[in-house]
A protein has these predicted regions:
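Core of compact, soluble alpha-helical bundle domains
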Residues: 26-198
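C-terminal motif of bacterial Sec signal peptides marking the signal peptidase cleavage site
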Residues: 15-18
Length: 198
């Protein structure tokens, strides 16, 4: 699960790079005094509610809450009656290095890496100190993080639609902001391809 999130994070980064404008410096956006915090791929995306990127709109507490919600929803699904039917087995092997390097991180590290990736990808700083008190780096290689997981396109789509989007909306992100400043990264074909089938 941790590696899937890492993969998601990396894929999101790749997508954001592809979707971003060329304004990677820290100068204010044209016609505004808004100076984005980060330099990640989603820095140039703008939320409908604020005309700022997701990180600058929602902040650290919201990102932690959404991240924890994604993890909780995913673990509840694979541990519940549906089991691995929709998400596959990748989340059931977190912390089991015998399944391959993509699974080596324990659950806490997986969660921290996912959070750092999401923060960076959506316009925040390149590294964060997470709720566990440890420092995590956001820029990650999604393809490498998902090697051996054999995630299918339908599993990926299910994860985004049934774990990620509800985690966002349950934590106060409007549908308009999901569409404007979160979805472009995870729905990008190149980002998805960096995770699926590895």
């Amino acid at each position: 699960m941790r590696n899937t999130f890492a993969a998601l994070a990396l894929a999101s980064t790749a997508l954001l790079v592809g979707c971003g404008d060329d304004d990677d410096d820290m100068t204010p956006d044209a016609g505004t005094t808004y100076n984005p915090t980060g330099t990640g791929p989603g820095t140039s995306l703008r939320c409908t509610s604020s005309n700022k990127n997701a990180w600058d709109t929602f902040g650290a507490n919201a990102f932690v809450a959404v991240n924890k919600s994604i993890v909780a929803k995913t673990l509840a699904e694979v541990g519940g009656p549906k089991g691995t039917t929709n998400l596959g087995e990748s989340f059931t092997h977190i912390g089991d290095a015998s399944k391959g390097p993509a699974y080596a991180d324990d659950a806490a590290t997986f969660e921290g890496k996912l959070a750092a990736f999401l923060v960076y990808a959506y316009g925040g700083p390149e590294s964060i100190t997470y709720a566990d008190g440890k420092m995590y780096t956001g820029p990650q290689n999604m393809a490498a993080a998902h090697v051996g997981m054999a995630i299918t396109a339908s599993q990926y789509d299910y994860f985004i639609a049934n774990m990620v989007v509800p985690a966002l909306t349950d934590n106060g992100v409007t549908a308009a902001d999901v569409s404007s400043c979160f979805a472009p990264i995870v729905t990008d074909a190149a980002f998805k391809a960096s995770i699926v089938g590895k």
